[in-house]
Each structure stands twice: as structure tokens, then as C-alpha cells.
Curated annotation (Swiss-Prot):
<dbReference type="Pfam" id="PF01809">
    <property type="entry name" value="YidD"/>
</dbReference>
<dbReference type="InterPro" id="IPR002696">
    <property type="entry name" value="Membr_insert_effic_factor_YidD"/>
</dbReference>
<keyword id="KW-0997">Cell inner membrane</keyword>
<comment type="function">
    <text>Could be involved in insertion of integral membrane proteins into the membrane.</text>
</comment>
<dbReference type="GO" id="GO:0005886">
    <property type="term" value="C:plasma membrane"/>
</dbReference>
<protein>
    <recommendedName>
        <fullName>Putative membrane protein insertion efficiency factor</fullName>
    </recommendedName>
</protein>
<comment type="similarity">
    <text>Belongs to the UPF0161 family.</text>
</comment>
<keyword id="KW-1003">Cell membrane</keyword>
<keyword id="KW-0472">Membrane</keyword>
Length: 69
């Protein structure tokens, strides 16, 4: 399951993300953050951290540097 999710993120980063350009308000990008958190912490905690990060992605959040902790 984890490998499948990482594969889908890789497909998104390789083929879809370049089409929309650099629009992420965070560094690293949300897809990179998801890949790092899933690789570092596994499926459950990685998905939890990714969900929290995506919930922060809205016009009222300033964004900025938000590394995987």
C-alpha cells in the first residue's frame, strides 16, 4: 500500500505538477512533504502529517518553510 501511494505521488510530481507550475505556498512542496513523511514515518503517521499539511494549504495561511519533523 505504501509503495503504491509513493508511486502515485511520483507520477504526480513527474507529469502533473510541471503542468501547473510552482504554485505551492510551502517549502518543501506538499507532494514532496507527503513523500518525505511517508518514507520517514510509514503509512499511518505519514498520512496523518500529510493531511495536516494539506489542511494548512489555504489562502489565509502564510505558507513558508515547513519541513517534515
Amino acid at each position: 500500500m505504501l509503495k503504491g501511494i509513493l508511486y502515485i505521488i511520483g507520477i504526480y510530481q513527474r507529469y502533473l505538477s510541471p503542468l501547473k507550475g510552482p504554485t505551492c505556498r510551502f517549502y518543501p512542496s506538499c507532494s514532496r512533504y507527503a513523500h518525505e513523511s511517508l518514507t520517514r514515518y510509514g503509512l499511518v503517521k505519514g498520512l496523518w502529517l500529510t493531511t495536516i499539511r494539506i489542511l494548512k494549504c489555504h489562502p489565509f495561511h502564510p505558507g513558508g518553510v515547513d519541513p517534515v519533523k
